[in-house]
From Swiss-Prot:
Gene3D superfamilies: GroEL, GroEL-like equatorial domain, TCP-1-like chaperonin intermediate domain
Name of protein: Chaperonin GroEL
Main location: cytoplasm
Superkingdom as given in the UniProt entry: Bacteria
Free-text function comment from the UniProt entry: Together with its co-chaperonin GroES, plays an essential role in assisting protein folding. The GroEL-GroES system forms a nano-cage that allows encapsulation of the non-native substrate proteins and provides a physical environment optimized to promote and accelerate protein folding.
Organism: Staphylococcus haemolyticus (strain JCSC1435)
Amino acid sequence: MAKDLKFSEDARQAMLRGVDKLANAVKVTIGPKGRNVVLDKEYVAPLITNDGVTIAKEIELEDPYENMGAKLVQEVANKTNEIAGDGTTTATVLAQAMIQEGLKNVTSGANPVGLREGIDKAVRVAVQALHDISQKVENKNEIAQVGAISAADEEIGKYISEAMDKVGNDGVITIEESNGLDTELEVVEGMQFDRGYQSPYMVTDSDKMIAELERPYILVTDKKISSFQDILPLLEQVVQSSRPILIVADEVEGDALTNIVLNRMRGTFTAVAVKAPGFGDRRKAMLEDLAILTGATVITDDLGLELKDASIDMLGSANKVEVTKDNTTVVDGDGDDNSIDARVSQIKAQIEETDSDFDREKLQERLAKLAGGVAVIKVGAASETELKERKLRIEDALNSTRAAVEEGIVAGGGTALVNIYNKVDEIEAEGDVATGVNIVLKALSAPVRQIAENAGLEGSVIVERLKHADAGVGFNAATNEWVNMLEEGIVDPTKVTRSALQHAASVAAMFLTTEAVVATIPEPDNNDNPGMGGMPGMM
């Protein structure tokens, strides 16, 4: 396939147009008075959202050079979302500001490599300064504030705070769609372990790349399953029941894995295979935990059991199982309550007896998985469109609160980035390196400027006043008042702010040091130039 090339200024300007198109669509959503963006969805109702990464993912531009620029900013949003789970709009605004300012300097003759060095130096100082002003999240109320700010909804903040209170900061919290109008929180018994599906073809939701199984049977074994014939008699019994099955084994490979995937794709039955969690003796113990939770019998040589002789009554079951590429969550297992209580007591006794810190930690993990719960936030709304938008906001808010617990909080609304302005300004540098530092300095005020403009105000005036305000004092765009952001509960997780700045700077530096761009020339559409009629198969 033929390629087209652009060099230096032509290349960068073409990509900049793409950066601006994507960033301009995303940045209208930032702040309490940010707007929504409507995304066209084939075959279903349009999606209305203010989630930066969701908007960024939808944008595909016709011009290949513009599209490459847009994809770079998409990468900023994706990486920030991956690391911190929120802050994607802030990251996009920062990236656009750095790229625009940097490009002006490159066009004026600055050396891009020197600019990159200055950008890197400034970001290192900025990140350290953010950590220096960061405050720990101390209580349930502060967790609720973080969630409320992220979702722009106090009620959502309370639900997330309650969920984290019930299952712990590292507990499993899932978000589901409710059939009613109200959003509810419920905690159900569940277990999560860090093993995902063995093939992506096992997913039931290709958009989210997850497998959701309702009322599945659960096979628990420490054996390696290589031959499909070994599990065929058991699967035939499962097929007759019209229920899905989760297979937890040492490994599913060879023709066993191939046939499971083929039958899943044909719709014969739904089966998801995951590797058993843990290693060695710990793996055996965790499989026994899972078996007790779900009412299964572990198919193991220790009990003299063979897979080909296994019957359906040896399988466990659960109300729901969710499997991602990295994790499996079993919700509401059908195990006997007395057996579960006895197992919990046994693990507690082992924790008391052990002298090893490592063993104690692993036993406590097992106890949490067995005795702990899964908190489910059931999202309600008046329409499907509102439901999807609300669900996205809650997912962002949950990620934000977890990030806040991990690294603390700073003043929100972009205030913290302006508060660290002086620290970055103190960096001693010369020439193009100093120019690189100035690129970051100018970008630090971009989120506040955009939040003010989305509120219908003059961004430059707000930024100038903020630079001279006391630390922590910022502009509340929701009420148009100057307040102490931390006291008012207008906060951002340090991790979110830090990640947004780091990823924006990384992509901006790559953009500025780009000297050539290679794009694929689209092939002409044959329908535009229909050939002469002829016999089938003839040229």
